[in-house]
């Protein structure tokens, strides 16, 4: 059993996953803000911005791993986690494309394009994912937690 400061009892990986998704909004907001700040800094002081880019890309990689692990663990079909604007699969594909593009811009030293990506495309992609995470949470809750609650 895991307990947080509010003494919420978490007794299963499913509950821990839902708890994590409930608190992911703030983490994604930080990623969005850090991306925009890094993009702005890139236009002013490239060296300083590059120093903040590594922690940002590490955090983005961690988020990607978190999402991938959840979807693998709960056998989520990302195409089914969707709203009127598209699916989690499409949003995560866009996210991964952004990450590849960041690497390409760094390798080619295309700082202007990198700054633009960090200011616009990456934050909008993260916002899109952020809007879909409550649906992922609902899916896990409905499929894995609620049935367990009904049996107890």
Spell out what each predicted region is:
Residues 1-152:
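C-terminal-biased regions
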């Amino acid at each position: 059993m895991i307990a947080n400061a509010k003494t919420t009892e978490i007794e299963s990986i499913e509950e821990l996953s839902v708890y994590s998704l409930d608190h992911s909004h703030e983490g994604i907001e930080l990623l969005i803000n850090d991306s925009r700040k890094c993009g702005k800094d890139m236009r002013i002081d490239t060296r300083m911005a590059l120093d903040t880019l590594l922690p940002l890309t590490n955090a983005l990689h961690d988020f990607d791993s978190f999402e991938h692990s959840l979807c693998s663990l709960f056998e989520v079909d990302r195409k089914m986690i969707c709203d009127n604007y598209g699916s989690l699969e499409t949003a995560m594909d866009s996210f991964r494309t952004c990450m590849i593009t960041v690497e390409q811009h760094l390798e080619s030293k295309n700082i202007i394009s990198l700054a633009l990506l960090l200011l616009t495309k990456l934050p909008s992609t993260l916002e899109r994912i952020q809007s879909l995470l409550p649906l992922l949470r609902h899916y896990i809750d409905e499929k894995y937690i609620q049935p367990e609650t009904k049996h107890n």
